[in-house]
A protein has these predicted regions:
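Short, charged, intrinsically disordered terminal tails
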Residues: 1-11, 425-434
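Phosphate-interacting basic helix/loop segments used at nucleotide- and nucleic-acid interfaces
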Residues: 5-7, 86, 143-148, 234, ...
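A generic structural signal for well-ordered coil/turn residues at beta-strand boundaries
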Residues: 19, 27, 40, 98, ...
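Glycine/charge-rich, flexible interdomain linkers and switch-proximal surface loops
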Residues: 97-101, 149, 234
């Protein structure tokens, strides 16, 4: 059989197209090359003329060329460098041996504890749980924080956001939740954090105990692609444990820096900055990640807390607004409460858990509603009370709120090491309100 005919027949069953090409153009966050036809999401690498390599992911596929965003920085690369196809799609190691380890989004361990022994490689991008396969959120997920357990009760498989400006106490609260919950597995994604904050989070917020945790970290000096896919890699690890029938706590800090990474990539690709500098892809990326959390029938659950850095304490920020519309609840931290020395500084009047009323008893619901009503009365009349314009006896309910003010503030404040069971939080609520 002629060689040309043999090649044509083989091409019908196998992809025999070239798997290498060369760099044509280099831009700050995107490299263009030609020579073969990869698909969007494929992983390629540049062999630089100085002997080093740079791995990237294809984000643009055209007839004559393709563009990819690098995972690491491309200093030293030049036009004409060789580009090789590596694999179809990004995978990440999963398995029980990941517990206690710290990894980067490329699956490399960064904790100096030796080589990683993993079970298999799992795809980083997966389809969220089908709507009709989602289990109902009907069980309490206790986190050991009084103001959350008592007033913003979380459910197993719920997705919540922690919204706050910088320096208000998001990381401390997330550490309390991680240590206070009873989930056997905790997966933590630290995205866009300063390098020094990674060991600080482990030692200060987790008290050095990583035995039930897997931590995926992409620091602020990593490339936009590393920061973007760090969150997806961590979610793939959480899904592995969920599929084993386990209940998983997923913590991510922060969604804002995750969206900023996609903003850098989107703008490099020429997307219009439509919403306060964010291109459409940055906003559409949030549900792709967040909807992967939840409870699945005949499997386990992923209860997720996503921190959202609110620029200038503006809750109408596009990322905060988009996140709030996707999540099942929001916990708003208040700079004013921080100034008053109340920690965790949760603004219970601006916060909400959309499933709370369905997972706690009627008596617990009544307690939570009454506490919020009395606290709201205090806030509405705070100035009148301070300047002495309010006379006791004018409003029976406000009188009760004033008498219980110290006890209510004591309930909202909690030392980060004084975590307590769910039942104890409601017992304390009942004592205050009786």
């Amino acid at each position: 059989m002629p060689l040309k005919s043999l090649k044509n027949r083989l091409n019908q069953h196998f992809d025999l197209s070239p798997r290498y090409g060369s760099v044509k153009k280099i831009m700050p966050n995107i490299v263009y090359a030609d020579g073969f036809n990869p698909s969007v999401g494929d992983v390629v690498k540049i062999e630089k003329s100085d002997g080093t390599e740079c791995v990237g992911m294809v984000v643009v596929a055209e007839k004559e060329q393709f563009g990819f965003t690098p995972f690491n920085f491309i200093e030293g690369a030049r036009a004409g460098d060789k580009v090789l196809f590596l694999k179809e799609g990004l995978n990440f190691p999963v398995g029980r041996n990941l517990l206690g380890r710290v990894l980067n989004p490329l699956g490399q361990v960064i904790d100096n504890k030796g080589a990683l022994d993993y079970e298999r490689l799992a795809p980083v991008i997966t389809t969220p749980i089908a709507p009709l396969k989602r289990g109902l959120i009907d069980e309490v997920f206790s986190v050991g924080v009084k103001s959350i357990d008592g007033l913003l009760t979380c459910g197993k498989g719920q997705k919540l956001g922690i919204f706050a400006g910088s320096g208000v106490g998001k990381s401390t609260l997330m550490g309390m939740i991680t240590r206070g919950c009873l989930a056997p597995i905790k997966v933590i994604a630290l995205i866009g954090e300063r390098g020094r904050e990674i060991p600080e989070f482990i030692e200060k917020n987790l008290k050095g105990d990583l035995s039930s945790c897997v931590l995926v970290a992409a620091t602020s000096d990593d490339s936009p692609l590393m920061r973007k896919y760090g969150a997806f890699c961590a979610m793939s690890v959480a899904e592995y444990f969920k599929n084993q029938g386990l209940d998983v706590l997923f913590i991510m800090d922060s969604v804002t820096r995750f969206a900023m990474a996609q903003r850098e990539i989107g703008l490099a690709l020429g997307e219009p900055p439509t919403s306060k500098g964010y291109p459409p892809s940055a906003l559409s990326l949030l549900p792709q990640l967040m909807e992967r959390a939840g409870k699945e029938e005949n499997k386990g659950s992923i209860t997720a807390f996503f921190s959202v850095l609110v620029e200038g304490d503006d809750l109408s920020d596009p990322i905060a607004d988009q996140a709030r519309s996707i999540l099942d609840g929001h916990i708003v931290l208040s700079r004013e409460l921080t100034d008053y020395g109340i920690y965790p500084p949760i603004n219970i009047l601006n916060s909400a858990s959309r499933v709370a009323k369905d997972i706690i008893s009627e008596s617990q619901n009544l307690c939570a509603r009454k506490f919020r009503r009395l606290y709201a009365l205090l806030k509405e009349n705070e100035m009148l009370i301070r300047i002495g314009s309010y006379q006791m006896g004018n409003d029976k309910e406000l009188d009760e709120a004033i008498k219980k003010k110290a006890l209510m503030e004591q309930f909202l404040a909690q030392d980060e090491n004084a975590l307590q069971p769910f039942e104890a939080s409601f017992q304390q609520l009942e004592e205050i309100l009786k």
